[in-house]
Amino acid sequence: MLGKKLHVKKNDTVVVIAGKDKAKTGKVLQILPKKDGILVEGVNITKRHTKPRGSESGSIVEKEAVIHVSNVMIYCSKCDKAVRTRTNTLEDGKKVRVCVKCGEAFDK
């Protein structure tokens, strides 16, 4: 069974609108539909302590943690801010997401 359909896709640029990383922008690295979450580059950084294994020494690794999809909005480069999207159908029948304010297409 597939998860829910989310309003963001992989490689979209998004703006965090709530939480400790509010107003940060980043690229979507991974979509997790079953958790309603996404991984955003440089947002919600957590520290992971790793134990020494064999010849490797223990260390503290910083990595992105999941953020809920409701806490982000798609970033429109033409409007230069976070925007809502609308779905438009092109002449060839293909559906694309567009900015509500300016009409800029996000799906090329």
Swiss-Prot record:
Q: What organism, scientifically named, is this protein from?
A: Geotalea daltonii (strain DSM 22248 / JCM 15807 / FRC-32)
Gene name tied to this protein: rplX
SUPFAM superfamilies recorded for this chain? Translation proteins SH3-like domain (SSF50104)
Tell me if Hydrolase is a UniProt keyword of this record: no
Gene3D superfamilies xref list: 2.30.30.30
Asked if the keyword DNA-binding belongs to this entry, the reply reads no
User: For this protein, what is any one GO molecular function term?
Assistant: structural constituent of ribosome
For this UniProt record, the keywords arranged alphabetically read as follows: Ribonucleoprotein, Ribosomal protein, RNA-binding, rRNA-binding
CDD domains assigned to the protein according to its UniProt record, in alphabetical order: KOW_RPL26
A single Pfam family it belongs to is ribosomal_L24
Instruction: Please give the function described in this protein's UniProt entry.
Output: One of two assembly initiator proteins, it binds directly to the 5'-end of the 23S rRNA, where it nucleates assembly of the 50S subunit. One of the proteins that surrounds the polypeptide exit tunnel on the outside of the subunit.
Intrachain S-S bonds: none
Q: What is this protein called?
A: Large ribosomal subunit protein uL24
Give the multimer and partner information: Part of the 50S ribosomal subunit.
Among the record's GO biological process terms, what is one? Answer: translation
Q: Name one GO cellular component term.
A: ribosome
InterPro entries in the cross-refs: KOW, Rib_uL2_dom2, Ribosomal_uL24, Ribosomal_uL24_KOW, Translation_prot_SH3-like_sf
Family affiliation: Belongs to the universal ribosomal protein uL24 family.
